[in-house]
Amino acid sequence: TKFYHALTKQRRVRNKIVGLHDDLGNWITEENGIEKVAVDYFDGLFSTTNPTDFDNFLDEIVPSISPQMNHILLRTATEEEVRQALFMMHPEKAPGPDGMTALFFQHSWHIIKKDLVEMVNNFLVTCNLDPRLNITNICMIPKVERPTRMMELRPISLCNVGYKIISKVLCQRLKICLPRLISETQSAFVAGRLISDNILIAQEMFHGLRTNKSCQNKFMAIKTDMSKAYDRIEWSFIEALLNKMGFDPRWITLMVECISSVQYRVLLNGQPRGLIIPQRGLRQGDTLSPYLFIMCTEALIVNIKKRRG
């Protein structure tokens, strides 16, 4: 036991943020100053560019969601559906601002199940989240030893369990629609597809480029890095995309409410500091984010195919 306590203490000391460089390169060590550097960084990252015209970019998206699918997406949540969403969670993952892990909710299910089902269905009917549910802590994981800049820290969102339950219920429903929406060029997060398939395809393509002389003169491969891809997605684009795909307006409202009603606090050395009201972006740590992201990526893929053709 002493060994693990010492290891935890050592890691806490090693990961402690004693100072950060601000945008001008100044070294800030005062606690309130470090908070300002972090808050200013995320304020800038989550500030919208106010894009408006998506018609041309979404022109090739074909409505794929039938009225029957929309009915399934918006139906009343059952007790079993909520129970599955809760018990899918790791019981001891890092807690959100409420300070409670999923373990407490799982052990207390027989007592609180009625309240949890009512909470989920209240959201499905009103499309309004209790603001307290969507307060989120940003935990910053060092990418390097002794980080000195915000770019050297990886933000992970720690959500409240109540929000996670709602999010997982919505995700389990959305999963049913994904095979109709997502082309086979994307293999992540879609049931029946493996991301390893695309790795094998990429290896075969590069092998062909290296060994086939005719390919070397006519083809090329481009690797793109989507820097801060989740953080820069505009909410207005997601709304326009979902509408184009044929989702019911009420489902779109549910999605937008989940991603836009969030308020962030930054965990600095274990303490929540500052307040960030984002204008765009998807949370890394929210169950919905990967599914919304691959749907946005699908719009990019459709446009690449359009230009190629």
Set out the residue ranges of the language-model regions.
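Conserved pre-motif C helix in the palm subdomain of viral-like polymerases
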Residues: 151-182, 200, 206, 279-309
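Active-site-adjacent bridging/hinge elements
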Residues: 13, 134-135, 139-149, 175-181, ...
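Short, residue-level hotspots on alpha-helical faces of the histone-fold
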Residues: 40, 44, 106-110, 114, ...
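Surface-exposed loop/turn segments and immediately adjacent short secondary-structure elements
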Residues: 1-151, 157, 165
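Conserved polymerase palm-domain catalytic core
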Residues: 226-309
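Conserved catalytic palm subdomain of right-hand nucleotidyl-transferase polymerases, strongest
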Residues: 19-21, 93-100, 148-158, 199-243
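Residues immediately flanking
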Residues: 91, 97, 143-144, 161, ...
